Amino acid sequence: MEEGSVKAMRKHALIVGPRRVGKSTLIRKVIETLNCSVAGFETKKESKMEDETLGSPIYIHTIGAPWHYSEENLLGYCKNQKTQRISDAFNRYADKLLQPVPEGTILCFDEIGFMESKEKAFCDAVLERLDGDIPILAAVKDKEIPFLNQVRNHQNCKCFFITEENRDKLVDEVLEFMKNQIEK
């Protein structure tokens, strides 16, 4: 297959970068400007809910639904920049990733990281969505882990590497890419 035809097939934008560089902020700006329906998930470390022993809880929330905090969506804890995953927590969310979405909706995965890399059902659901035609806007950690490498190297994905220096101008580039995917 020619290089040009591979690029033409790409449907999904992956925002790749280190911790705290602005991946989620960029995604939020793009989504607000696109003004379309969005489904998917976002993960959030809740520092204000920190437990002295365990650290800060990390939850997964369905985009568009009210946030809640329960065992059902608790993924693990982060203490001193080290995470402890709750076994099978991501796998419990896998079915939600594969639910049908209305026409004209984009998917947002904020973010795909290393905690879920050992959760087969969740990883398979992410890869199945990447194989599909619904445009995806996702934040992806820049760690060298087999699952994350598989996501970043997926033939349907275009990686946008974010830095503190380029993050403001990258918004327009990602926005243009996503607009083109929605219009197809």
Task: Name each region found by the language model.
Residues 2-10:
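Phosphate-binding P-loop
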Residues 77-127:
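Phosphate-binding/switch loop-helix module in NTP-utilizing enzymes
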Residues 19:
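The conserved Walker
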Residues 15:
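Hydrophobic anchor at the beta1->P-loop junction of P-loop NTPases
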Residues 23:
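Conserved lysine of the Walker
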Residues 26, 30:
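Hydrophobic positions on the alpha1 helix immediately C-terminal to the Walker A/P-loop
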Residues 31-81:
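N-terminal phosphate/diphosphate-binding loop that engages ATP/GTP or pyrophosphate donors
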